[in-house]
Amino acid sequence: MKEIGLVENNYYFVQKSARKIGVEFRVGNHTISLENFEFYERMSEETNAFSADLVMNGKVVGDCSNSGRGGCADYHAYENRDLAREIATAVSEVEDYCFPKRKLTLEDVIDQLASFMIVLQENKVTTITKAKAVVKYLNEQAVKYRKMYA
């Protein structure tokens, strides 16, 4: 995979194949990403409704979803549970980008990955050039958001 750019603290856009752009979260030597991502706009009320395979270090370890009715993502690790536990612990050491006094949870990371996947899908991002433009825009927005809540 070719790295395209850092979107936000620990989130990277990556080129997965010739016409596929993805996003992954990195902490230490670990990566977290979503595969077979499906967004359900009609079911999204307070949060984004989605379902996906949860991938850690390149291996599908389970599935994740959000019903879209508020609250955080649900995930179920049905394989490599020790790896999932280890990565969840590593994630809990990372500060939230917008709220530095708060530590992240694996649910936060999954929801943010889903949000980035929706941006990629809705903007039909399939090229590195377009992905770089989206990275630039998202970084500008994140800086504005962080200043608002600083």
Predicted regions located by residue number:
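Terminal leader/tail segments of proteins
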Residues: K2-A150
